[in-house]
């Protein structure tokens, strides 16, 4: 239920107006208390999707009609939020979120950060990310729809494969931890009115989550792991999130979960890529979140199918996890 106000600023010189600037603003509070998030003093649950600014006609170029359609689809399906995965969206898109009352997790283009590089290159990358945070916050700080800053999506620890294999969550290396902590602290220093987060891949060290305000977890139990075993998938999800919550006592948003689906592909029994499996997959995650108090949000991956690299995993060069095709 958005309420926007027109703020006008006048520059005068000897009683003459020589310039004006007009900005639509909204007034709201967002804060984290314990393992809950509060909007205007009331608990809020994040219900929505990860998105891409993409059109089948114009690709990743800005397309305002496509943005309007996306926001209409979000409203129609009952969503209240989305993440700008995995880069800043156009300011026109954020203005649409303001006007429609969506909550936006705003993310810099730090996707799949790797740290197995020489120090000089890592330092260059860090300065670039710091500049991106500064630029993004300065651009979007006056948008009421923006309620959280995300400093990275799925950074990779050096020993990620071993962590995913044995399920152990030991301390991370010092280089990557310092890198991410620097970005988190920068965001908090520039804007202390919004929570700061990062979207964590399976196997992320808990060290990386110590300084975030809200924990975002990208989890694909039932798709990349425990395929066709949704009972086992939810059990693994529940066990992992329970351990993370016990050690952090922070609100958790499942920021990605999904199953690729080919339109029109059906099966009576569980079968990957069928519409039935995708629906059951989503249903299980929703049921788990509903009964888990510290899971304060779900963002399905993804709002609509999108173009990606050609591979044996990507039928037709598309990611087919979209709720819409």
Where in the sequence are the language-model features?
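Flexible, active-site-proximal loop/turn residues at the rims of small-molecule/cofactor binding pockets
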Residues: 11, 31, 55, 88, ...
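Short low-complexity, flexible loop/linker segments enriched in glycine and/or proline
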Residues: 96-100, 119-130, 213, 268-270, ...
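Aromatic-lined substrate-binding rim segments of carbohydrate-active enzymes
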Residues: 70-126, 174-194, 231-242, 246
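A short acidic, helix-capping loop that chelates divalent metal ions and anchors anionic groups
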Residues: 53-58, 113-117, 157-160, 224-225, ...
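Secreted/periplasmic carbohydrate-active enzymes, especially glycoside hydrolases
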Residues: 1-104, 132-138, 142-148, 164-167, ...
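Short, small-residue-rich loop/turn micro-motifs
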Residues: 43, 48-53, 106-112, 153, ...
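Substrate-binding clefts and catalytic carboxylate motifs of secreted carbohydrate-active enzymes
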Residues: 145-150, 159, 166-190, 196-198, ...
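Alpha-helix capping and helix-loop boundary segments enriched in small/acidic/polar residues
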Residues: 58-62, 88, 120-127, 170-175, ...
């Amino acid at each position: 239920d958005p309420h926007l106000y027109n703020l006008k600023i006048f520059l005068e010189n000897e009683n003459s107006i020589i310039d004006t600037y007009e900005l639509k603003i909204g007034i709201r509070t967002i804060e984290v208390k314990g393992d809950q998030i509060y909007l205007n003093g009331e608990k809020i649950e994040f219900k929505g999707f990860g998105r891409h600014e993409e059109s089948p006609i114009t690709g990743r170029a800005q397309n305002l009609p496509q943005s309007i359609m996306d926001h209409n689809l979000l409203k129609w399906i009952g969503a209240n939020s989305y993440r700008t995965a995995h880069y800043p969206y156009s300011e026109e898109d954020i203005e649409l979120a303001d006007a429609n009352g969506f909550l936006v997790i705003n993310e810099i283009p730090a996707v799949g950060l790797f740290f197995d590089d020489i120090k000089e290159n890592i330092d260059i990358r860090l300065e670039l990310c710091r500049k991106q945070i500064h630029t993004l916050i300065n651009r979007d700080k006056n948008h009421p729809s923006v309620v959280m800053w995300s400093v990275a999506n799925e950074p990779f620890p050096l020993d990620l494969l071993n962590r995913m294999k044995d399920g152990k969550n030991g301390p991370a290396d010092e280089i990557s931890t310092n890198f991410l902590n620097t970005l988190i602290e920068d965001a908090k220093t520039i804007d202390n009115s919004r929570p700061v987060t990062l979207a964590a891949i399976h196997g992320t060290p808990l060290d990386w989550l110590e300084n975030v305000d809200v924990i975002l977890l990208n989890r694909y139990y039932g798709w990349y792991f425990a395929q066709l075993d949704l009972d086992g998938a939810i059990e693994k999800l529940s066990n992992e999130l329970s351990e993370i919550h016990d050690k952090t006592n922070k609100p958790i948003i499942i920021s990605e979960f999904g199953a690729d689906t080919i339109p029109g592909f059906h099966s009576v029994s569980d079968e990957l890529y069928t519409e039935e499996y995708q629906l059951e997959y989503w249903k299980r995650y929703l049921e788990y979140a509903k009964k888990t108090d510290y899971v304060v949000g779900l963002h399905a991956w993804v709002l609509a199918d999108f173009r990606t690299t050609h591979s044996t995993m990507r039928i037709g060069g598309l990611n087919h996890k979209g709720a819409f095709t």
